[in-house]
Design a protein with these regions (language model features):
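A conserved acidic beta->alpha catalytic loop
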Residues: 27, 39-49, 62, 86
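Acidic helix N-cap motif at the loop->helix transition within catalytic regions
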Residues: 19-22, 44-53, 94
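Conserved donor nucleotide-binding strand/loop of the catalytic core
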Residues: 48-72, 76
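Short aromatic/hydrophobic "clamp" motif used to bind/position activated sugar donors
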Residues: 82
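Catalytic-site signature of metal-activated, phosphate-bearing donor transferases
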Residues: 7, 68-74, 91-222
């Protein structure tokens, strides 16, 4: 066992990232030993900004393939381990300190390190939506990226699961770039893997092409192949699509279909609650919101939302009970939600409402 410390190359691919790249690099430049930036066609000040941090800037002709660009970036790294980030990712102060500690203590037998990825944060700085990615890998293993879009890094060997969180702070609006890559691949006669089909459906939904997304999700779910976690997630997103189309029964059926793959998840129970709530079926909604708080947290899932198991369903139960005229219960669940997110604006709004309803305060 060797814990004498490691050296790290940071690899990033960029294109028109002038708004975020400095923020990203500021958080890691004093930790990593090398910064490698691959530019895929920036026309803004991205490269000018990057030059202040590293001389290792390489141009790569964009070929609608994120894996190709990432593999090129990895090929330019020279240190023992490679850390990868996107330009709109950041390491908060606690994560910076944790990475410094990991760098000094990591067992050199470790081939890959996974880290939590906080994709969406609430007003209290807590993650609303999380996943986990392999972020730090041993260079000599020559691990490769696969997939034109929503690429993944294939790793093997000795794995270490760390608690160093990478935080995503997206600045750009949703575009149809990824959707077009899938569409072009299909037009060129390329066969999509189940994973590609899953992400093609996600991109279609993100671009509000709900009918297209429904067909893609249904096709994916009807295949025997495919990871069960992606199947569970696809059921929920299919439910979202049907809800957007006003097909309420199909929306519930789609979410409930996820139960065939594992015990009910808080994310899909909360979804079903929203579907009934939108139809003003408040008792049914309360049932599903309550269930969301009782099922076990799927913390090992790459697609989990901690809020869907606690304050989010409690807050919706507050609204449902209020609609049913049960203000005592409504107040109770508002305060229960507040125990998780005390500074939430919706909770404060509800408190003002209840002050107008009650002559006295209630405690949880």
């Amino acid at each position: 066992m060797n814990k004498q410390g490691i050296t790290i190359s940071l690899c990033i691919i960029v294109r028109d990232e002038e708004k975020t790249i400095a923020r990203c690099l500021d958080g890691v430049e004093e930790i990593v030993d090398e910064i490698v930036v691959v530019d895929t066609g920036s026309v803004d000040r991205t490269k000018e900004i990057v030059e202040k941090y590293t001389p290792n800037i390489y141009d790569f002709q964009w070929i609608d393939d994120f894996s190709a660009a990432r593999n090129f970036a990895f090929s330019k790294a020279t240190q023992q381990y490679i850390l990868w980030l996107d330009a709109d990712d950041v390491l908060l102060e606690d994560a910076q300190e944790a990475l410094k500690q990991l760098k000094g203590q990591l067992d050199s037998n470790v081939d890959a390190v996974s880290m939590p990825y906080h994709l969406v944060m609430d007003s209290n700085g807590k993650p609303l939506y999380c996943t986990r990615r392999y972020r730090l890998v041993k260079r000599e293993k020559q691990f490769q990226w696969f997939g034109k879009v929503h690429e993944y890094l294939a790793v093997s060997g000795e794995i270490f699961n760390s608690n160093i969180a990478i935080t995503h702070k997206k600045e750009k609006e949703v575009t149809d770039r990824n959707l077009k890559i899938f569409q072009n691949a299909v037009a060129a006669g390329e066969e999509l893997s189940p994973r590609d089909l899953f992400y093609y459906a996600n991109e279609s939904m993100d671009n509000q092409k709900y009918n297209d997304a429904v067909l893609l999700y249904e096709t994916f779910l009807n295949q025997d192949e495919g990871w069960y976690e992606e199947k569970i997630y696809a059921c929920g997103k299919l439910g979202d699509c049907y809800a957007k189309l006003g097909l309420w029964e199909k929306a519930v059926e789609a979410c409930a279909k996820s139960f065939r793959y594992d015990v009910p998840r808080g994310e899909n129970c909360t979804r079903i609650g929203y579907i009934y709530m939108d139809q003003q079926k408040y008792n049914e909604a309360i049932f599903w919101f309550k269930l969301a708080t009782e099922v076990p947290l799927a913390k090992d899932s790459p697609f989990h939302s901690p809020a869907s198991y606690t304050w989010l369903p409690y807050l919706q139960m507050c609204i449902c009970y209020s609609k049913l005229g049960e203000q005592d219960k409504a107040y109770y669940y508002n305060e229960l939600a507040a125990s998780y997110v005390p500074n939430n604006a919706a909770i404060e709004y509800n408190r003002k409402y209840f002050r107008g309803v009650f002559d006295k305060q209630y405690k949880v």
